[in-house]
Amino acid sequence: MIAKLKGILDSITDSYLIIDINGVGYQVYSSGKTLMKLIKEEGSIVSLFIETHVREDRIHLFGFLDNTEKVAFNMLQSVSGIGTKMALHILSNLTPHQLQIAISSQNRHQLKAISGVGPKLIDRLMIELRDKVANINTIANNTSLATLSTDSNTHDNILSDAITALIALGISRAEATQILSDIYALSPSISVNELVRTALQRRAK
């Protein structure tokens, strides 16, 4: 089960993105809001929380920048008649916080403004999620604690991520390790993306 992906953002379409990890491209479906936030990050290293759906003939990956959106995605699917496509459509129009407020305050108008969301579906959302939406942040925070240690930008993690990125671009591990170590020694507070960009610039000279 894939729970998280970290790699180079290869490309973005209007419904999914492709993350390149060691030369393998993973197709990840995301909400419109997530895709818009990532549109300027093409070529950079990104990290996404993943919800994996396994079917008889295929595997679908759904990606989220934060765990709150992932929790909201799964919560929406607990409502009768809502599948992955509609859940992403709703989250393309409302943030998890906006969804939480709309349902808690029984604001039907905010949900009605979303195309494809009719009166009957709104009724089900209001009834079935009324007692659940207040827990979105709590659930998200609790599940995030399990992966917190793997997200820390320690020296080893930064170098490892940068090396992976350069290898994906066709640079040998030995060369990537040497050039990145030299740069990192001079700028220990540098981010992964800055480290990769600096390495590519130095290599091009």
Curated annotation (Swiss-Prot):
Biological process according to GO: DNA recombination; DNA repair
Assembly behavior: Homotetramer. Forms an RuvA(8)-RuvB(12)-Holliday junction (HJ) complex. HJ DNA is sandwiched between 2 RuvA tetramers; dsDNA enters through RuvA and exits via RuvB. An RuvB hexamer assembles on each DNA strand where it exits the tetramer. Each RuvB hexamer is contacted by two RuvA subunits (via domain III) on 2 adjacent RuvB subunits; this complex drives branch migration. In the full resolvosome a probable DNA-RuvA(4)-RuvB(12)-RuvC(2) complex forms which resolves the HJ.
Disulfide cysteine pairs (residue numbers): none
First and last residue of the signal peptide: none
Domain description: Has three domains with a flexible linker between the domains II and III and assumes an 'L' shape. Domain III is highly mobile and contacts RuvB.
GO cellular-component term (any): Holliday junction resolvase complex
Keywords: Cytoplasm, DNA damage, DNA recombination, DNA repair, DNA-binding
Name used for this protein in its record: Holliday junction branch migration complex subunit RuvA
Phylogenetic placement of the source organism: Bacteria, Pseudomonadati, Pseudomonadota, Alphaproteobacteria, Rickettsiales
Annotated region (Domain III), positions in chain: 154-205
Location in or out of the cell: Cytoplasm
Organism, as annotated: Orientia tsutsugamushi (strain Ikeda)
Residues covered by region (Domain II): 66-144
Record-linked CDD domains: UBA_RuvA_C
Region (Flexible linker): 145-153
HAMAP family, per database record: DNA_HJ_migration_RuvA
Region annotated Domain I, chain positions: 1-65
Principal subcellular localization: cytoplasm
GO molecular function: ATP binding; four-way junction DNA binding; four-way junction helicase activity
Family indicated by similarity: Belongs to the RuvA family.
Pfam families: HHH_5, RuvA_C, RuvA_N
Summary of the function given for this chain in its UniProt record: The RuvA-RuvB-RuvC complex processes Holliday junction (HJ) DNA during genetic recombination and DNA repair, while the RuvA-RuvB complex plays an important role in the rescue of blocked DNA replication forks via replication fork reversal (RFR). RuvA specifically binds to HJ cruciform DNA, conferring on it an open structure. The RuvB hexamer acts as an ATP-dependent pump, pulling dsDNA into and through the RuvAB complex. HJ branch migration allows RuvC to scan DNA until it finds its consensus sequence, where it cleaves and resolves the cruciform DNA.
